[in-house]
Amino acid sequence: MTKVNSQKYSKALLEVAQEKGQLEAILTEVSEMIQLFKENNLGAFLANEVYSFSAKSELIDTLLQTSSEVMSNFLNTIRSNGRLADLGEILEETKNAADDMFKIADVEVVSSIALSEAQIEKFKAMAKSKFDLNEVTVINTVNEKILGGFIVNSRGKIIDASLKTQLAKIAAEIL
């Protein structure tokens, strides 16, 4: 499925949830389903043509047992439109669209050593202002190859203040 189609389905779900005043509840359901899909590799199951439509439909019936009315209608629409193979992607796109709506993001900070809590808080504040976000979760990744400094990545926007990059720039200027 194309990203455009995933966006259409996710936008429709978010609009209906908003109209019914159930946006927060639906987003909770979406997060739970994403987790369920990851833990049980359900996306691969639904995308695999080896399994019959009825087997995949049984999975949706199981999900419907614990779903709200809005989510149930959404899942039934996905099933009737033959988009079960794309359900995982649609759920991820729904989460991304909601994160954009509420200005929420995970921010990866790559550093040569683990960051302290105080440093993480500073990166949260910096990311909120630089990327215009309301809520930030900092994910610290240690990579000794950057030598020092840091690289901040939030949804494709990158701030590279690593020593390795600065040295490479100096070397390029000299040569």
Curated annotation (Swiss-Prot):
Q: Name one Pfam family in it.
A: OSCP
**Entry keywords, A to Z:** ATP synthesis, Cell membrane, CF(1), Hydrogen ion transport, Ion transport, Membrane, Transport
- Give the record's membrane topology: Peripheral membrane protein
Q: One GO cellular component from the entry?
A: plasma membrane
InterPro entries associated with the record? ATP_synth_OSCP/delta_N_sf (IPR026015), ATPase_OSCP/dsu (IPR000711)
Please report any disulfide bonds recorded for this protein chain, giving both cysteine positions. none
A GO term, aspect molecular function: proton-transporting ATP synthase activity, rotational mechanism
Chief site of localization:
membrane
Subcellular location per the Swiss-Prot or TrEMBL entry: Cell membrane
Q: Which SUPFAM superfamilies match?
A: N-terminal domain of the delta subunit of the F1F0-ATP synthase
Cytoplasm is among the record's keywords: no
- Supply the NCBIfam families for this chain: ATP_synt_delta, PRK05758.2-1
Role according to the record:
F(1)F(0) ATP synthase produces ATP from ADP in the presence of a proton or sodium gradient. F-type ATPases consist of two structural domains, F(1) containing the extramembraneous catalytic core and F(0) containing the membrane proton channel, linked together by a central stalk and a peripheral stalk. During catalysis, ATP synthesis in the catalytic domain of F(1) is coupled via a rotary mechanism of the central stalk subunits to proton translocation.
Q: How does it assemble?
A: F-type ATPases have 2 components, F(1) - the catalytic core - and F(0) - the membrane proton channel. F(1) has five subunits: alpha(3), beta(3), gamma(1), delta(1), epsilon(1). F(0) has three main subunits: a(1), b(2) and c(10-14). The alpha and beta chains form an alternating ring which encloses part of the gamma chain. F(1) is attached to F(0) by a central stalk formed by the gamma and epsilon chains, while a peripheral stalk is formed by the delta and b chains.
| Similarity comment: family membership | Belongs to the ATPase delta chain family.
**Protein name listed in UniProt:** ATP synthase subunit delta
